[in-house]
Amino acid sequence: MLLCIDIGNTNTVLATFDGDELVHSWRIKTDALSTADELGLMFRGLLAGDAVEVTGVAACSTVPTALRSVRTMLDRYYPDLPHMIVEPGVRTGVQLAIDNPKEVGADRVVNTLATYTLYGGPSIVVDFGTTTNFDVISGRGEFLGGAFAPGIEISFDALAARAAQLRKVEATRPRSVIGKNTVECLQAGLYFGFAGQVDRIVERMVEELGDVRAVIATGGLAPLVIKECRTITHHEPMITLIGLRMVYDRNV
């Protein structure tokens, strides 16, 4: 089976594929200081628990220090297996129609490939993670750029940190947009404000594009808020891993 690894700022998601079929998946906390040996032993433990036999590995990361450890881990623990890390020089088939292609994160590239392959374009991917990333894909499958916004958990943390009379509260949907106490008022403003922000950014993007085939939600925090977002058309929690599989097939 192919092992795909997506290392984000907060979480690392792994999945195994048998051909096009996703068979197993795991989500663990990202530690940018993890050594190659720690990663190797952890991944081997996860795979052994489900009796998974790996025949190849594909990886991408937005965390440079973690990516170096992954590269060393692959060479040390899987030296005989074909493996691929999404980085400049890897064939993705995605044209980057932006000012500086070197600035584009690997996750955004593989999201573009998977979304265009599955849904066509124009399309928009909203990745709900530590940050909220909006990725715009043309009708020809080009990556056109997008937008960044704070993630919902960052927004909750920032308000508590900067407002003396307010404390940190759980990032969750309140019972009403009209809060009856301090906690509910915080949750109402942040939660519904965040959902409204997502919808407005997507609406403005659609206005510029003219029309879209799909608006895809992904990322670990997507389930928290997508029911309140009126512009989301599909939820694909594994879109990055699916894209990794597609890039691997193009290169190995």
From Swiss-Prot:
Q: Which GO terms describe its cellular component?
A: cytoplasm
Q: In which pathway does it act?
A: Cofactor biosynthesis; coenzyme A biosynthesis; CoA from (R)-pantothenate: step 1/5
Instruction: List the protein's name.
Output: Type III pantothenate kinase
| Residue numbers binding K(+) | D127
Q: What's the gene?
A: coaX
Gene Ontology BP term (one): coenzyme A biosynthetic process
Q: What is the lineage of its organism?
A: Bacteria, Bacillati, Actinomycetota, Actinomycetes, Micromonosporales
Details of cofactor binding: A monovalent cation. Ammonium or potassium.
Residues binding ATP: D6, I7, G8, N9, T10, N11, T12, V13, T130
Q: Name one GO molecular function term.
A: metal ion binding
**Pfam entry (one):** Pan_kinase
In this protein, the active site sits at D107 (proton acceptor)
Q: Which InterPro entries match?
A: ATPase_NBD, Type_III_PanK
Q: Which domain of life is it from?
A: Bacteria
| Localization | Cytoplasm
Q: EC number(s) on record?
A: 2.7.1.33
User: Required co-factor?
Assistant: NH4(+); K(+)
According to the record's subunit comment, the protein's assembly and interactions are:
Homodimer.
- Binding, substrate: G105, A106, D107, R108, T182
